[in-house]
Regions:
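Substrate-binding groove of N-acetylhexosamine-processing glycoside hydrolases
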Residues: 1-27, 33, 47, 97, ...
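Feature activates predominantly on carbohydrate-active enzymes
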Residues: 2, 35-246, 252, 318-321, ...
Length: 613
C-alpha cells in the first residue's frame, strides 16, 4: 500500500489521516466520513488512489458517504504514441496516476513501431521507441497502482514507418500493409509477441488489424492470385491468434474490416438489418475480442446499427470512442468530445457492452498534449461511472489544481470562443498554415473572424497558474499569432488589388508581428513537447513551424520590395482565387480538420511513402 500512498502524495499532495480505516471489498468503492472518522472500502489499488482524490476533494471531518459501483468491467484509455509524440516515461507514470484517480482501470499505449523488438533492429529505428527496460518499468508501476497496462500494436496495416525500408527486411503487400501468408511476416509477429510477453504482466493484447482496405491487392495478388479480403483476413487472423495463444495472450482487434465488409445491401435482411454469414461468425478465433470503434456520433441512435451488428458475434465485444483530437493540431476540441462521450456511453450501456476504451489519436504529428484532454478523460470516466457534474468539477480541481471550466478555454481558438461546438472544424490549424500569398482557403474565410482569437486570448488570461499552466501559455501564444494571421492573406490581396499602398504597409507591419509571435509560439511549444514527450518527432514540428516562419519572412521581404518599387508586381496576388476549389467546407465559412493540408503547392504536411510492388 505504501506505493499507492506515495503516488497519491506525489500527484495531489494528500495523505490519509492516521485514523483512516481501510477495508478490502469484493465490490466497488465506498467512502464513509464523519468528524474524526474515515473508512475506505476498496477492491484494488486503483480504487484506493481514487479514494484519495475523492477525500481530498470533499474534505476531512465532514459527514458524507460516497459509493461507486463500476458499470463496466474495463474502463480503458488508449493514447497514441506512434505519430511522433512518444510519451516519455515520467509522463506515462503521471498519466497512470491520473487515470487511477479518475476511475479508469487500464491503459493502452498505441505503438505501431515505437517499441523495441528483439532481433528486429529497424523496428522503431530513430523514432524514440520504448526500450524493453522502459516497458517493464512502466508495467511494474502500473500494476502497483492497480492499472492494467495493455500493449496496443499493429500486426497487419498501419506500419508505414517500416515500409520505407527494403522489402528484404519486412515484406509488404502494398501501402502500409504487411504481406500475409509469408514466413518472414510470421517471424516478425513471433518476435513481437515474444518480446512483449517479457515486458507485460497482462494477458490482453490489442493487435490492431484495422483499415487494411487494400489487403491482397498488391504483392499478395501477384504471388497468390485474387482472393476476397475477408478470406485473406481470416487466414492471417487465425495465424496471429495462434502465435498469441502460444505466448498466453488474449488478442483484441479493431473490427472495422469485418464491419465494413458486411455493412452493405448484400448482407441486409428485409428489415434493413445486417446479417453476418454464420460461417464468418463461426470462423473467428474463440480467443479473440472484437472492438467496435466509432468516434463521431452525437446521438445514441447513431451507434445502434454498429452495436446491433456486433451482438451477432460469439466473441466478447469492446467499444472504443474518441476524444476529438486527430488532425486538430496543438489544441483539443473538448466540448465536442463531451457530446460524443455521452451519446456513445449511453448506447453502450443500452446494448450491455462491458468494455469501454476512450481513445486519443494523434494523427499528423501527435501535436496535442495528452494532458490537454484531461477534462475529456474525466468527463468520459464520470459519465461511465454515473457521477454528477458537480463531483466531476470538484474532483477535477483536486486532481489538477485548475478549474474544469478554465481548462475548457483551451477549446476557444478551435470553436471561435464556444460559438461552434456541435461539429468539428479546425481554425487554429488551417488558420496557422493557410498561406498569406497563395491563400487557397481565403475565398471561404471571413477575415473578421480574427476577432475570436483576441477574445480567446482574453479568456486564456483568466486561467490561473498551476501545474498545467504551460498548456495555457502555448494556447495563448497560438491565439495571439492567429489574431494577426488568420485574415491577413485576405487583407493583403484586397489592398493589392485596390493598389492601396497605405493598407499594404499596415499588412507589412502585421507580417512582422506574425513573425515575432510565431517565434514565441515555437519556443513555448518546444518546451511543452519536451515536458511530455521524448524529443524524437519534434523535428517535424520544427520543420513545419520553421518553414512557416521562413515563408512569412519571405512574403514580408517581397511585399516590402513591392512597396519600395524594387518589383512591380507580386505574381501570386495577381491570380484570382476560386471558391469552388475549396473542399470540406463547414457552415459559416469554416473548414474541417484536413483542410490545413490543402495549400496550393505539393507539400509535406502529410507524408506519403512509396514502396515497390
Amino acid at each position: 500500500m505504501q506505493k499507492v500512498f506515495d503516488a497519491i502524495f506525489e500527484e495531489i499532495n494528500f495523505k490519509f489521516p492516521n485514523y483512516c480505516v481501510f477495508n478490502k471489498s469484493d465490490s466497488g468503492l465506498k467512502i464513509e466520513s464523519a468528524k474524526g472518522f474515515l473508512r475506505v472500502c476498496y477492491n484494488n489499488n486503483a480504487q484506493l488512489l481514487r479514494a484519495g482524490l475523492i477525500v481530498k476533494a470533499n474534505g476531512l471531518d465532514l459527514e458524507y458517504t460516497i459509493e461507486e459501483q463500476p458499470r463496466f468491467d474495463n474502463l480503458c484509455f488508449m493514447v497514441d504514441c506512434s505519430r511522433n509524440s512518444v510519451k516519455n516515461v515520467e509522463s506515462v507514470k503521471k498519466l497512470i496516476r491520473n487515470l487511477a484517480m479518475l476511475g479508469y482501470n487500464s491503459l493502452m499505449l498505441y505503438t505501431e513501431d515505437v517499441y523495441e523488438v528483439k532481433n528486429e533492429k529497424l523496428f522503431g529505428y530513430l523514432r524514440g521507441k520504448y526500450t524493453i527496460d522502459e516497458l517493464k518499468d512502466l508495467d511494474s508501476y502500473a500494476v502497483s497502482l492497480g492499472i492494467e497496462l495493455i500493449p496496443c500494436i499493429q500486426t497487419l496495416a498501419h506500419l508505414n514507418q517500416l515500409s520505407r525500408y527494403s522489402n528484404r527486411y519486412i515484406p509488404f503487400d502494398c501501402s502500409d500493409i504487411l504481406l500475409v501468408n509469408n514466413d518472414r511476416t510470421h517471424q516478425l509477429i513471433e518476435n513481437i509477441f515474444s518480446t512483449l510477453r517479457e515486458c507485460f504482466t497482462t494477458n490482453r493484447i490489442h493487435i490492431g488489424m484495422d483499415e487494411a482496405g487494400m489487403l491482397g491487392r498488391g504483392r499478395y495478388l501477384a504471388i497468390n492470385g485474387y482472393k476476397d479480403r475477408v478470406t485473406i483476413l481470416k487466414e492471417h487472423l487465425s495465424r496471429v491468434c495462434e502465435i498469441a495463444e502460444k505466448y498466453d495472450f488474449e488478442p483484441i482487434i479493431w473490427s472495422d474490416m469485418f464491419r465494413n465488409e458486411f455493412n452493405c445491401d448484400k448482407y441486409k435482411n428485409k428489415d434493413g438489418k445486417v446479417e453476418i454469414p454464420k460461417e464468418v461468425i463461426d470462423s473467428i478465433p474463440k480467443n479473440l475480442s472484437l472492438c467496435y470503434w466509432d468516434y463521431h456520433g452525437l446521438t445514441k441512435e447513431y451507434f445502434y446499427d454498429g452495436l446491433e451488428m456486433h451482438k451477432q458475434y460469439k466473441n466478447p465485444v469492446w467499444f472504443a470512442g474518441g476524444t476529438a483530437m486527430a488532425n486538430r493540431g496543438i489544441l483539443p476540441h473538448l466540448q465536442y468530445s463531451f457530446k460524443i462521450a455521452e451519446s456513445a456511453i449511453t448506447a453502450a450501456l443500452e446494448f450491455g457492452v462491458k468494455n469501454l476504451i476512450e481513445t486519443m489519436w494523434g494523427d499528423n504529428g501527435g501535436e496535442c498534449s495528452v494532458f490537454a484532454v484531461l477534462p475529456a478523460l474525466a468527463h468520459y470516466s464520470y459519465t461511465a461511472l454515473g457521477c454528477s457534474s458537480e463531483r466531476l468539477k470538484k474532483e477535477f480541481y483536486a486532481l489538477t489544481g485548475h478549474n474544469f471550466d478554465d481548462f475548457i478555454r483551451l477549446d476557444y481558438p478551435q470553436t471561435f470562443c464556444g460559438k461552434y461546438t456541435d461539429d468539428i472544424a479546425n481554425p487554429a490549424k488551417y488558420g496557422l498554415y493557410n498561406d498569406v500569398f497563395t491563400g487557397y482557403l481565403d475565398p471561404i474565410l471571413n477575415a473578421n473572424d480574427k476577432k475570436y482569437f483576441i477574445q480567446a486570448c482574453e479568456e486564456l488570461k483568466k486561467c490561473k497558474e498551476g501545474q498545467y499552466f504551460y498548456l495555457f501559455k502555448t494556447a495563448y501564444a497560438l491565439s495571439d499569432l492567429l489574431y494577426y494571421k488568420y485574415g491577413l492573406g485576405i487583407e493583403i490581396r484586397k489592398a493589392y488589388k485596390e493598389k492601396n499602398n497605405e493598407e499594404l504597409r499596415g499588412c507589412l507591419k502585421n507580417l512582422d508581428y506574425c513573425i515575432r509571435k510565431l517565434e514565441i509560439l515555437i519556443r513555448l511549444y518546444r518546451k511543452q513537447w519536451l515536458i511530455e514527450n521524448k524529443p524524437h518527432g519534434f523535428e517535424i514540428q520544427e520543420i513545419r513551424l520553421g518553414g512557416l516562419l521562413e515563408r512569412l519572412k519571405g512574403c514580408k521581404l517581397r511585399l516590402k520590395d513591392y512597396l519600395n518599387g524594387k518589383i512591380d508586381k507580386i505574381d501570386e496576388l495577381d491570380e484570382c482565387l476560386i471558391a469552388d476549389a475549396v473542399g470540406r467546407v463547414k457552415p459559416n465559412n469554416r473548414c474541417d480538420e484536413y483542410s490545413y493540408m490543402s495549400i496550393a503547392s505539393v507539400n509535406s504536411f502529410d507524408g506519403y511513402t512509396y514502396i515497390d510492388v
